[in-house]
């Protein structure tokens, strides 16, 4: 009798076990086996316009057949369609459909590396940032040119660029405009540590003024080693007080003329360009322009804070086109340097 019961048990138990193993194998195959058909990590972007079908369509281009079938089953039999989370999601070669499902359902994003570019205008900044974010350039530009929003962070629309310190930051692709500005404000405060703030204070300059001067330095030279020297020359002009210049010597910085005209490709600045009525015209106006003419590099900012102490008041690009400058104490010396450079430009046919 016992042998008969054992036989009956084995008769049903073994097939059941085989079926169970088969089911487990299928579950593993569809939900836990490698989802991606690609050998490296891929990323998908889910935005506000997506639904279950479009999400599956985006993933199907990188998925195995069993992987996309498994994910489709999970998405169809869950509440995912009621709350689709935007974001940038990583799909690694080892991830199964179930892990992908959990990531996109719970909003477990992979951050993007957002590099703040050294651009000249807010519209260009907006365009460059939008290339890495879900935000479009028009939305970013609208925020950056909103006086109330700028004032909330301690700036105006002419100085808001001062808050963007060039670096690479990890942010989420679907970051909101407010959170983006909050992050930039925190990074700016982190950059302006006690040491840098003290240096600016000793120079009698605000952080925005330092950044504005740094933007001119960066436009004048790409040579980081020379930037402290150039900064020292412009600082001398800012602080000069005598009978001829009771309020300071005009900076007469050619890059500000390019900015005033929005003609950034100019190779030479002629006298007819110097009469433009603009607060950025440092030939007509004494002191710094009302805001930076580009987002300056960290090297440019530190060049201002650590400027070389000398008594030069003039500089002119060297005639060898090395990207460096000849410095002069007097206008007469400067005219000689300028004549040599002008001759070199003419010889090369640069107009």
Please give the residue ranges for each predicted region.
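Bacterial extracytoplasmic/cell-wall-associated proteins, especially those involved in peptidoglycan
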Residues: 127, 134-138, 142, 149-351
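Signal peptide-directed extracytoplasmic domains
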Residues: 28-192
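N-terminal type II signal-anchor transmembrane helix
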Residues: 2-41
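Pocket-edge positions in alpha/beta enzyme catalytic cores
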Residues: 16, 44-47, 92, 202, ...
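Intrinsically disordered, low-complexity regions
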Residues: 4, 23-26, 88, 155, ...
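N-terminal start-of-chain detector that recognizes signal peptides
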Residues: 14-19, 61-63, 86-88, 139-144, ...
């Amino acid at each position: 009798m016992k042998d008969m019961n054992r036989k009956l048990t084995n008769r049903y138990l073994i097939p059941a076990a085989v079926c169970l193993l088969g089911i487990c194998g299928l579950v593993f195959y569809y939900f836990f086996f490698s989802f991606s058909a690609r050998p490296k990590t891929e990323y998908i972007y889910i935005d506000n316009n997506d639904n279950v079908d479009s999400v599956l369509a985006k993933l199907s281009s990188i998925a195995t057949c069993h992987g996309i079938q498994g994910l489709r089953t999970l998405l169809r039999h869950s509440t995912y369609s009621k709350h689709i989370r935007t974001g940038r999601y990583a799909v690694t070669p080892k991830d199964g459909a179930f892990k992908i499902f959990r990531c996109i359902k719970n909003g477990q994003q992979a951050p993007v590396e957002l590099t703040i570019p050294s651009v000249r205008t807010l519209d260009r900044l907006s365009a460059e940032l939008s290339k890495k974010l879900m935000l479009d350039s028009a939305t970013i530009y609208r925020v950056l040119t909103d006086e109330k929003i700028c004032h909330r962070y301690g700036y105006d629309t002419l100085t808001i660029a001062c808050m963007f310190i060039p670096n690479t930051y990890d942010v989420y692709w679907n970051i909101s405009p407010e959170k983006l500005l909050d992050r930039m404000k925190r990074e700016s405060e982190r950059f302006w540590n006690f040491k840098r703030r003290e240096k600016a204070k000793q120079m009698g300059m605000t952080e925005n003024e330092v950044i504005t001067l740094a933007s001119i330095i960066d436009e004048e030279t790409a040579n980081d080693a020379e930037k402290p020297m150039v900064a020292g020359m412009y600082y001398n002009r800012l602080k000069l007080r005598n009978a001829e210049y009771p309020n300071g010597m005009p900076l007469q910085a050619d890059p500000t003329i390019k900015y005033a005209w929005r003609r950034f490709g100019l190779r030479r600045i002629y006298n007819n360009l110097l009469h433009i009525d603009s607060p950025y015209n440092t030939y007509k106006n004494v002191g710094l322009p009302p805001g930076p003419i580009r987002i300056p590099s960290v090297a440019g900012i530190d060049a201002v804070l650590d400027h070389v102490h000398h008594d030069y008041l003039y500089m002119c690009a060297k005639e060898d086109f090395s990207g460096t400058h000849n410095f002069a104490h007097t206008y007469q010396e400067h005219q000689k340097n300028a004549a040599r450079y002008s001759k070199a430009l003419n010889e090369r046919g640069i107009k």
